[in-house]
């Protein structure tokens, strides 16, 4: 029996057929599906590219893994099975960082303020960043804000309703754009915060606004299910009426409530505070209005408030309120937590901050490199904020805790200090010691090459002792948390940066920028892996004759500026690495520093 002949479908037959086959519809559907798949592929590629652009170091990777990596099963076999004839090539070893980035299991919360108003394109870019963070294991708890609305609710009933409708629509927009980027989101229109009544709730009255366990359940359920809760900036008053309040007050209340330990299996302790706005980071007095890169709240909070310029109230109207927000939230969050104030024009900074927990540029790099090089600081450069530690400058051995300093040096260098020899030398030659926190880090500077007799003569054009960086150490538990940058910046302000506007720092015992800058000199073993870090911060270096050491130096910026101005108005010749009047000093440095005895026991 012959198979039935299938009719041929042609355009002519379709015209004659009462119910033609929807060929065009299938084509359109396939085209639509293909377009969606391409959009998903493009977004995945952009996600992976943003991770690569963060350029995490080995320490950054370990830090990320400790917080976001999935737990390792205890029963994984360590032995490699014997190969059999049927075995092919062994599968490549898995990279734990890649697995943690692309397949996160732990969900860590972050508090996020989206400080609009934003256009659809701007808000979509922000929500794409939030979706990428969710893929990396950070679930954003978002509170929407609008700069174009009064911070508190209007007393006029109809105006209050209009304002409430605007922020409600803002929540819906955020959820919509998150969903477009395949990020599960949940609008929370319920009121999670309450305004304390001093008479009925005296314990909560100091907070002003607080979050009860019942209100926190909305956030806990969303985070536990991997959804992004998007909240209104509202709170219940004592009459159980919902009122719009400043978003910062809601975020502060959430930071306090989410950091309180409970028996719930969902850990709500926030790891980050992200403020996404239109004005960028917090402007710096020392950088002529460009943003701070890194803020040590313990040392700089009051100083930044005092030096905030009146004109910045127009260009950065919410900078100080966001600084207060960061200070309040970080007080409740873990030590390793940070806050990021970032413009919507810098979405890649969100990924970089999560993986590295570092600023866009190291704050300890030379100022000229930060403002003149490729990738330099702009108004949109984000500001990273940490709790930090207080910084002190000690100028006598009586102020130094020798036991704590010894413990820091021996722990950092993993060697035994010759205490008697080291401290006897410091009694004679100490210039100053910079201490961060309770000896979490320290920089010890001495004055070398001082006159030993009346016949002593300094080399020409170098009529002063050498400011020598004898020891620079950060405790291992504080490596990677910004302490090293805070320490180096304080060191620069007391030595080669002294006399510059940006050396006016608030550290206890510092010179506050008053004085004349001095060249800073130090040495490091030729095979020291830290030398790469020194190369980036020094003006130059040379190898000693025996090639065991490298001598580094940082030229006094004030003196370099004077030389530059002379060249600029006297023919325009560029400043050389070693000017004529500087010749001979490096040789003298090498001789003097080479005679310094070792601080370590044999």
UniProtKB/Swiss-Prot annotation:
Function: N-acetylglutamate synthase involved in arginine biosynthesis.
Gene source species: Cryptococcus neoformans var. neoformans serotype D (strain JEC21 / ATCC MYA-565) (Filobasidiella neoformans)
GO cellular component: mitochondrial matrix
Pathway note: Amino-acid biosynthesis; L-arginine biosynthesis; N(2)-acetyl-L-ornithine from L-glutamate: step 1/4
PROSITE patterns to which the protein is assigned, alphabetical: GNAT_NAGS (PS51731)
Enzyme type, top EC level: transferase
Family annotation (InterPro entries): AceGlu_kinase-like_sf (IPR036393), Acyl_CoA_acyltransferase (IPR016181), GNAT_dom (IPR000182), Vertebrate-like_GNAT_dom (IPR006855)
Subcellular location(s) per record: Mitochondrion
Catalysis performed (reactions): L-glutamate + acetyl-CoA = N-acetyl-L-glutamate + CoA + H(+)
Family: Belongs to the acetyltransferase family.
GO terms of molecular function: L-glutamate N-acetyltransferase activity
Matching SUPFAM superfamilies: Acyl-CoA N-acyltransferases (Nat)
Region (Disordered) residue spans: 1-21, 62-93
Protein name, per record: Amino-acid acetyltransferase, mitochondrial
Compositionally biased tracts (Low complexity): 74-85
Domain N-acetyltransferase: 389-577
């Amino acid at each position: 029996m012959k198979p039935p002949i299938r009719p041929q479908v042609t355009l002519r037959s379709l015209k004659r057929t009462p119910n033609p086959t929807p060929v065009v519809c299938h084509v359109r559907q396939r085209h639509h599906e293909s377009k969606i798949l391409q959009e998903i592929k493009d977004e995945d590629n952009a996600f992976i590219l943003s991770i690569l652009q963060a350029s995490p170091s080995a320490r950054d990777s370990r830090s990320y893994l400790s917080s976001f990596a999935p737990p390792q099963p205890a029963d994984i076999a360590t032995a490699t099975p014997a190969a059999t004839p049927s075995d092919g090539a062994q599968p490549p070893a898995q990279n734990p960082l890649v697995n943690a980035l692309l397949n996160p299991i732990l969900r860590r919360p972050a508090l996020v303020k989206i400080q609009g108003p934003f256009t659809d394109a701007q808000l979509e870019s922000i929500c794409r960043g939030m979706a990428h963070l969710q893929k990396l294991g950070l679930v954003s708890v978002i509170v929407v804000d609008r700069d174009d609305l009064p911070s508190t609710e209007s007393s006029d009933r109809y105006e209050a309703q209009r304002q409430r409708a605007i922020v409600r629509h803002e929540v819906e927009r955020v959820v919509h754009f998150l969903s477009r980027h395949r990020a599960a989101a949940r609008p929370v229109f319920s009121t999670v915060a309450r305004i304390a009544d001093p008479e009925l709730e005296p314990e909560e009255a100091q907070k002003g606004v607080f979050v009860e366990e019942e209100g926190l359940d909305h956030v806990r359920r969303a985070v536990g299910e991997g959804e992004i809760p998007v909240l209104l900036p509202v709170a219940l008053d004592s009459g159980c009426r919902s009122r719009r309040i400043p978003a910062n007050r809601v975020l502060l209340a959430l930071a306090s409530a989410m950091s309180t330990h409970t028996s719930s299996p969902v850990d709500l302790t926030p790891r980050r505070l992200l403020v996404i706005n239109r004005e960028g980071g917090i402007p710096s007095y020392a950088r002529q209005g460009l943003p701070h890169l890194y803020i040590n709240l313990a040392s700089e909070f009051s100083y930044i408030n005092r030096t905030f310029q009146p004109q910045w109230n127009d260009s950065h109207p919410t900078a100080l309120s966001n600084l207060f927000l960061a200070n309040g939230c970080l007080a409740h969050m873990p030590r390793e937590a940070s806050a990021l104030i970032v413009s919507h024009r810098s979405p890649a900074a969100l990924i970089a901050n999560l993986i590295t927990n570092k600023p866009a540029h190291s704050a300890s790099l030379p100022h000229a490199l930060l403002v003149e090089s490729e990738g330099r600081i702009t108004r949109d450069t984000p500001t990273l904020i940490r709790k930090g530690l207080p910084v002190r400058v000690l100028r006598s051995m009586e102020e130094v805790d020798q036991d704590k300093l010894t413990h820091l040096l021996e722990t950092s260098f993993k060697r035994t200090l010759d205490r008697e020899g080291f401290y006897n030398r410091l009694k004679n030659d100490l210039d100053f010691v910079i201490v961060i926190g309770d000896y979490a880090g320290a920089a010890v500077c001495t004055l070398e090459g001082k006159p030993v007799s009346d016949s002593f003569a300094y080399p020409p054009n170098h009529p002063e002792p050498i400011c020598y960086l004898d020891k620079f150490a950060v405790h291992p538990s504080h490596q990677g948390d910004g302490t090293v940058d805070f320490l180096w910046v304080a060191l620069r302000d007391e030595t080669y940066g002294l006399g510059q506007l940006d050396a006016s720092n608030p550290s206890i015992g510092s010179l506050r920028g008053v004085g004349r800058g001095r060249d800073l000199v130090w040495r490091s073993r030729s095979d020291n892996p830290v030398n790469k870090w020194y190369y980036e911060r020094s003006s130059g270096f040379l190898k000693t004759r025996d090639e065991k050491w490298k001598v580094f130096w940082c030229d006094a910026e004030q003196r370099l500026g004077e030389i530059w101005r002379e060249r600029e108005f006297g023919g325009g010749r560029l400043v050389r690495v070693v000017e004529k009047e500087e010749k001979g000093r490096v040789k003298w440095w090498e001789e003097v520093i080479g005679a310094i005895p070792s601080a370590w026991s044999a």
